[in-house]
UniProtKB/Swiss-Prot annotation:
Stated name of the protein: Platelet-derived growth factor C
Functional description taken from the UniProt entry: Growth factor that plays an essential role in the regulation of embryonic development, cell proliferation, cell migration, survival and chemotaxis. Potent mitogen and chemoattractant for cells of mesenchymal origin. Required for normal skeleton formation during embryonic development. Required for normal skin morphogenesis during embryonic development. Plays an important role in wound healing, in angiogenesis and blood vessel development.
Site (Cleavage): K225, A226, R231, K232, R234, V235
Gene3D superfamilies per record: Cystine-knot cytokines, Spermadhesin, CUB domain
GO cellular component, one term: extracellular space
Compartment(s) of residence: Secreted
Xref: Pfam families: CUB, PDGF
PTM comment text: Proteolytic removal of the N-terminal CUB domain releasing the core domain is necessary for unmasking the receptor-binding epitopes of the core domain. Cleavage after basic residues in the hinge region (region connecting the CUB and growth factor domains) gives rise to the receptor-binding form.
Disulfide-bonded cysteines: C104-C124, C250-C294, C280-C335, C287-C337
Subunit structure comment from the entry: Homodimer; disulfide-linked. Interacts with PDGFRA homodimers, and with heterodimers formed by PDGFRA and PDGFRB.
GO biological process, one term: positive regulation of cell division
Gene, per the UniProt record: PDGFC
Coiled coil: none
Family: Belongs to the PDGF/VEGF growth factor family.
């Protein structure tokens, strides 16, 4: 009887322990699943702290070859001396997965200011190398993320150097806020930005990422008509020479036009400031008409729409209203040499 009771007690203890282990395993699995981001990348529990006393570099895994998928790496650079700053310079060999709608959503490298949590920049793609970044204090954080799709090469390599405050002042001129400019001066300042991301970050440093995402929410887009220039058949060399004269003497060619001047909109800033259009150009030295002087004029004109960023002052409210808009521009598709006095005849 005692033996039977001992066996029952042992069985109960074993069952209770197995149940606790199963519950623990289920809890761990749930925590692991909830720790994943929506794109399937698991966030790291700890960042790698690098004590900086001299120049050095960090890079994506396997640089300059294809980096691995499903990766999140965070480095925090901390200078030993508190009165120095850290400057980051990207290697010319830069390439991550391309952005979607000019927004780096999937694979990207991001630089953050640890003192206030502000994002200094997020980059991806391979069309341009990111510019230099300078910390506000003696620390700076770098974050690299890749999702489970489309890894690229060569990744990135960032060289870091130490700067004293007076070096920073001489190297980086003061950038005035948008509110310090009139509309015409702000138009000139906007011309210096090479990407929409840099422009929005300048206009709205505290909420530029939200503004950039809001900017691309509309799904509609007006497309201009496509135009194709036909080619003539070329039989012999003389025909070729004559055809080249015809093609390049008075033909549609690329011209850059200022949107504010072209649209006569001095109350608005457009970005990009200028666009390429087809306009008639060239000379008419071999004009076939019997007149003293010929000129090149368009004989077929079409209107095409181009989507650009529009910045307009808000009435009674500080800041600029930002929106994507379609602007109509004239394109010359066919040109002809005519007598100057008969241009309108």
């Amino acid at each position: 009887m005692l033996l039977f009771g001992f066996l029952l007690l042992t069985f109960a203890l074993v069952s209770q322990r197995q149940g606790a282990e199963a519950e623990s395993n289920l809890s761990s699995k749930f925590q692991f699943s909830s720790a994943k981001e929506q794109n399937g990348v698991q966030e790291p529990q700890h960042e790698k702290i690098i004590t900086v006393s001299a120049n050095g570099s960090i890079h994506s895994p396997k640089f300059p070859y294809t980096y691995p998928r499903n990766t999140v790496l965070v480095w925090r650079l901390v200078a030993i001396e508190e009165n120095v700053l850290i400057q980051l310079t990207f290697d010319e060999r830069f390439g991550l997965e391309d952005p979607e709608d000019d927004i780096c959503k999937y694979d990207f490298v991001e630089v953050e200011e640890p003192s206030d949590g502000s994002i200094l920049g997020r980059w991806c793609g391979s069309t341009a190398v990111p510019g230099k970044q300078i910390s506000k204090g003696n620390q700076i954080r770098i974050r690299f993320v890749s999702d489970e799709y489309f890894p690229s090469e060569p990744g990135f390599c960032i060289h870091y150097t130490l700067l004293t405050p007076h070096q920073t002042e001489s190297a980086s001129p003061t950038v005035l806020p948008p509110s310090a400019f009139s509309l015409d001066l702000l138009n000139n300042a906007v011309a210096g930005f090479s990407t929409v991301e840099e422009l929005i970050r300048y206009l709205e440093p505290d909420r530029w990422q939200l503004d950039l995402e809001d900017l691309y929410k509309p799904a509609w887009q007006l497309l201009g008509k496509a135009y194709i220039h036909g080619r003539k058949s070329r039989v012999v060399d003389l025909n070729l020479l004559k055809e080249e004269v015809r093609m390049y003497s008075c033909t549609p060619r690329n011209f850059s036009v200022s949107l504010r001047e072209e649209l006569k909109r001095t109350d608005t800033i457009f970005w990009p400031l200028c666009l390429l259009v087809k306009r008639c150009g060239g000379n008419c030295a071999c004009c076939q008409h019997s007149c003293s002087e010929c000129q090149c004029i368009p004989t077929k004109v079409t209107k095409k729409y181009h989507e650009v960023l529009q910045l307009k002052p808000r009435s009674g409210v500080r800041g600029l209203h930002k929106s994507l808009t379609d602007v109509p521009l004239e394109h010359h598709e066919e040109c002809e040499c005519v007598c100057k006095g008969n241009a309108e005849g």
